[in-house]
Amino acid sequence: MRPVGSKYLLEEPLGRGATGTVWRARQRETAGAEAAVAGQPGETVAIKVLKEELASDADIVMRFLRERSVLLRLTHPNIVRVRDLVVEGELLALVMDLIDGPDLHRYLRENGPLTPVAAALLTAQIADALAASHADGVVHRDLKPANVLLKQTGGEMHPMLTDFGIARLADSPGLTRTHEFVGTPAYVAPESAEGRPQTSAVDVYGAGILLYELVTGRPPFGGGSALEVLHQHLSAEPRRPSTVPDPLWTVIERCLRKNPDDRPSAENLARGLRVVAEGIGVHANSAQIGAAENVGALLAPDPAPAQVPGAPDAAYDPNGATSVLPHTSGPAGAADPTAVLPSTGAPDPTAVMPPVPPGQPGAPGQGGPEDPHPWQNQLRAARDRNEQTQVQYLDPNQDPLRRRPQRQVSRPPQQPRQAPQGPPPQQPGYGYPQQQQPQRYATPQPQQPQRYAPPPAPEPQQPRREPRPPRQRSANPMRIPGLGCLKGCLVTVVVLFVAGWLVWELSPLQEWIGTGKGYWDQLTDWFTTVTDWIGDLGGSGGG
């Protein structure tokens, strides 16, 4: 088991997400006074260990420590309580209550959509949790079924909203740049996709998408890519399913308004959903049905929505004209505003350009063809979440690790340029009078298009050697050079056997062995016989 700090031990992983891994852990000793819940030794908790790239960001660590009190005091019956925060070296972890139950995304995948009444009551409890967090100035910004856990108590399931701390930390400047959004593309609000200031209305928009998915089984906006999904959020209207009652569709339509000022507050959303659940039920009376049909009057927007930390009050327009702040009187010793010096009679080189008429290139709000797409950063972030690593074949000739070193061609040294002869320019200083010259700006160089180096030419390949012809056997199978193989040995044995057999059959060797004479006696008798035979031949020839 892996220790986390000095008070917790990780036992087994429960899930893995985009920001870290959730572990089942056990408390070793009672937590200190800085923790929201002291706990008891042996108690089981859930710990979310953030990824190393988050823990190595100094901005996130400072926000982690600075907002410790905000996360620890965020308590509600429908919010997973953060018990403690652990910061140790390269480790950042959130200690939370362990919820024994599936998340809402898994439940919908296994059991299908909910009834309109059940969906309205479940979303009302989530809206209660959002209202409590908005009252504390905390905006979730990533509301989706995967961040809603279902706690089973007494045969009933209670939704528990989690990952508030992760959404809070994601606001760090080290992660969230200008014109980027934090969230999942299928559940992101239009103002988040456009990089506009965000308020608590983004959570109400996410609650509307969640409610739509609870009764239909899928989000209202989809597409084959992140660009299509974002385009649907910005321009398309959700389609009403035939199974959604009129009062419930009124709530969904108000939550999914493109203008955040037209969306209801989380508190009014919870109140309206409970009225709708009573009016569309089987045992609803006429008063409840009438109240549900007039639910639009209850969905009033929030007069003071919670602002996302770090969001500017107004979007920055890079093409807007420069504005001059008015002079305001301040206390003694305050810094004076910038003053314009009076004209001295010399020609003033600074000129005010006439305003560009609308519709012309360079007009405010109209980007040139080379300007980046306003959604470029959002699409890159969404694409990085959804793309997987692709493996493709690499030509060995283009592999820098296998490329042969090339000899660099020596170039002749360049001769230094000689400065033109002439009188040295007079520098303004002590020996020369200073003259006021008009300020001249160099003509801007036209932007050269980016050119890529051509691919290296393929190196000439050496001619391949012709393959060696196969070894051919001799026509005479008995010819074996040196008799150094098994075949030669067998032939030799056969020849010796045949020669011995011929000697045995054609020579008097059998008779000699049968008579028992010695080898020398047999040889002497044979020699005597041959001598007598030759002598007889000679005597008969002489007679």
From Swiss-Prot:
ATP binds at L14, G15, R16, G17, A18, T19, G20, T21, V22, K48. Autophosphorylated mainly at Thr and slightly at Ser. One of its GO terms (molecular function) is protein serine/threonine kinase activity. Its EC number is 2.7.11.1. Residues 303-480 are annotated as: Disordered. Belongs to the protein kinase superfamily. Ser/Thr protein kinase family. This is Serine/threonine-protein kinase PkaA.
